[in-house]
From Swiss-Prot:
Gene: NIPSNAP3A
Organism field: Homo sapiens
Domain of life per record: Eukaryota
Alphabetical UniProt keywords: Acetylation, Cytoplasm
Gene Ontology cellular component list: cytosol; mitochondrion; nucleus
PANTHER family with a match to the protein in the record: NIPSNAP-RELATED, PROTEIN NIPSNAP HOMOLOG 3A
Name of the protein in question: Protein NipSnap homolog 3A
Lineage: Eukaryota, Metazoa, Chordata, Craniata, Vertebrata
Length: 247
C-alpha cells in the first residue's frame, strides 16, 4: 500500500508540474504570425551624424525598394547621443534572408550608400521583435515626437506577465494624453524585453500627460500590479527624420 501511494503521489506531482513548466517558458501566440519587426540602432561618429542622415535620405528609395521601412528616428533624450533608430517590417525570416541577399547584390545601394557610409558608423545593434497579440501597429494622426519605453520583464514571457502589462498600457491609453503606436516583444536580442512605442504632440505635452497619469488611481493600480513582473525599464525620446514614414 505504501509503495502504491508513493507511486500515485509521484504521478500526480508530475501532472501538476508540467503545466507550470510550460507556462514559465511560453512566449505567447505572437509566434504564429510570421510578420516581425527588426529594430536597428546605429551609433554614429559625433561629427558624422548629419552627413549620414543626408546620405540616407538621398538613397532611401534604394533601400525601401527591398523591404518596408516603418520609421526612422534620431535619439534626442535617454540614450546614447548621435544615434539613429529605425524599424523594418518583414513577412517572415525567409523574407528577410531574401532581402539581405538582394541588398548584397544591389550595386547602386552598395556603391552609393553602404560602402561610402560604413566609416561613419561606430557601432550597430539589431533586435527581432513581434507585436504582442493584443496590439496592432497604429499610425499617429499628425507629426509629433515619439517615446520608446523599454521594459525588462521577469522570465516567463507574456504567459506570465502579459495581462498585467496590457492593463498598465491601456490605463495610460485611456487617459488620452498619448497615442499607442505599438507594443513589441523581443524574439532575438535581450529576451523578456518589451518595447512600447508612443506618439505625443511634443515633449511638453508628454510631460504634462505623465504628471496627470501619476495622479490617476486607475493608472496607479495597474502599474502597481505590473511592476511585480518588472526587472528594469528605460526610455528614449525619438525625433522622426524627414524621410520617416511615421512622423
Amino acid at each position: 500500500m505504501l509503495v502504491l501511494r508513493s507511486a500515485l503521489t509521484r504521478a500526480l506531482a508530475s501532472r501538476t508540474l508540467a503545466p507550470q513548466m510550460c507556462s514559465s517558458f511560453a512566449t505567447g501566440p505572437r509566434q504564429y504570425d510570421g510578420i516581425f519587426y527588426e529594430f536597428r540602432s546605429y551609433y554614429l561618429k559625433p561629427s558624422k551624424m548629419n552627413e549620414f542622415l543626408e546620405n540616407f535620405e538621398k538613397n532611401a528609395h534604394l533601400r525601401t525598394a527591398h523591404s518596408e521601412l516603418v520609421g526612422y528616428w534620431s535619439v534626442e533624450f535617454g540614450g546614447r547621443m548621435n544615434t539613429v533608430f529605425h524599424i523594418w517590417k518583414y513577412d517572415n525570416f525567409a523574407h528577410r534572408t531574401e532581402v539581405r541577399k538582394a541588398l548584397a547584390k544591389d550595386k547602386e545601394w552598395q556603391e552609393q550608400f553602404l560602402i561610402p557610409n560604413l566609416a561613419l558608423i561606430d557601432k550597430q545593434e539589431s533586435e527581432i521583435t513581434y507585436l504582442v497579440p493584443w496590439c496592432k501597429l497604429e499610425k499617429p494622426p499628425k507629426e509629433g515626437v515619439y517615446e520608446l519605453a523599454t521594459f525588462q520583464m521577469k522570465p516567463g514571457g507574456p504567459a506570465l506577465w502579459g495581462d498585467a502589462f496590457k492593463r498598465a498600457v491601456h490605463a495610460h491609453v485611456n487617459l488620452g494624453y498619448t497615442k499607442l503606436v505599438g507594443v513589441f516583444h523581443t524574439e532575438y536580442g535581450a529576451l523578456n524585453r518589451v518595447h512600447v512605442l508612443w506618439w505625443n504632440e511634443s515633449a511638453d505635452s508628454r510631460a504634462a500627460g505623465r504628471h496627470k497619469s501619476h495622479e490617476d488611481p486607475r493608472v496607479v493600480a495597474a502599474v502597481r500590479e505590473s511592476v511585480n513582473y518588472l526587472v528594469s525599464q528605460q526610455n528614449m525620446l525619438l525625433i522622426p527624420t524627414s524621410f520617416s514614414p511615421l512622423k
